[in-house]
Amino acid sequence: MKTCMNNPIIQQKFQDLQQKALKNIQGIDWEKPIYIFVTPNEYIGTVASVTDEKLLASSLQNLPTNWKPTKSNIDEDATWNSLKNGWQIAYKKHAILLMGPGNQQEAGTIRQTMREILNEDYDESFMSTPFYDELNQLKGDLNMISHINVLPIPYNTFMKLQLPENVSAQQTYLCSEIKIYQNKLCIQNTLNSNDKEAEKILEQQVTPQLTHFESFINTNNGIILYMHTYGEKLLHILREDPNFRAMLAGMNQVIDADLILRSIKGEALLQIQNFSESEVPTFTLQAQLANQNFMEKFPDWQKSAQKKKDMFIRPTHEGYHISYKNQHFFLNAGNNQLLLSSNAQIQCPKVKNSPHIMQSVTYMSINFDKLWRSSTNIQKNNSTNFIQSISEQLKSLEFKAKNCKKSTIDIYFR
């Protein structure tokens, strides 16, 4: 990631940061780009330009208590400082490298990683790669280039949703231009591939715009995910979240939920009202089907459920009521369409306050206030922890993909 210091909001943030954490730090050129990266061993690194090495050394002593250097030494590579908060600093004539965080046992590993970076030949460095040139051609206030698989959840999930069936995440990388406004971030994303065949597919793939379930979208829900998909892809996305993974495991005790979801092909609309106190979120899934042959298996699944405790399948006038322990699901399929819900009101009414998603082939929104309403005991995982950790600062998020290559993310702050 590369930052541009010309944006007035970024300048103000850095002034605030300098007053609080970097007070009196001198010797760093804050006007030049700052590069941020993540190492293969998952440490965060930051590189900035140094204008005066001696001035920098003396001013490091003016850091706040929780940032003050605890150890300092000089060798042939650089001047080294260990900070109290788990970060390591190395600087030499023209550059400063900050890396971490890590505990005391990790300090040696972090320093070794830093030493390898400091001693890299140009031909081995990031600067010699096409990615470096591509990064410097981006024109956002913040610019980022990354392989999809190393992005954090849910950001990597957004990108994977765009991919055609015959292009893998391993083949693609993301370029993002981030514009910063007073209460909003606008992120313009482009998916690229160094694989010529994959890049050709990304450029030429024509995905129809979402229309089939658009009128069913209800903006009172915490999460709305609307996309073109096929069963195996949707299964993979759901299994990344432990709450849905536990739900699928429970359903598979009674019916073959994997078989049902693998029958999906076409548009799919997943709406999560909120994360409830049980393991099962309050949700509704509507999807087009390649076939509904699984409905023929319900009589056999019913007989099997009758022989087991804590589970049942009951026909209703709208489909089937499926129960496993304290988990309840309601399913119906007809006209090659699936409706699966955690709510007994299985018929999904059309709503009038649907968001404007025209010209989108993938759409997702998160309303952070509505998502965590009445949720005090949800199953913790990286995804929910990430969202909860930022929900105090964020109001909502909206993701739109225009095609397989281009997408936007708008993040609104409180």
What residues fall within each predicted segment?
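N-terminal mature-domain "stem" immediately C-terminal to a signal peptide or N-terminal signal-anchor/transmembrane
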Residues: 1-7
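Leucine-rich, highly hydrophobic segment in Treponema pallidum outer-membrane-associated proteins
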Residues: 100-102, 108-237, 366-414
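Generic recognition of flexible, low-complexity loop/linker segments
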Residues: 33-34, 173-177, 211-214, 256-260, ...
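Short intrinsically disordered coil segments
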Residues: 62-65, 203-210, 242-243, 354-356, ...
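Generic detector of solvent-exposed, compositionally biased contiguous segments
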Residues: 9-20, 72-78, 144-168, 242-272, ...
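Long, K/E/R/D-enriched contiguous segments that form extended
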Residues: 221-304
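Single conserved position on a long alpha-helix in the C-terminal lobe of the eukaryotic protein kinase
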Residues: 19-134, 266-364, 412-414
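Short acidic/polar alpha-helix capping motifs at helix-coil junctions
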Residues: 7-9, 139
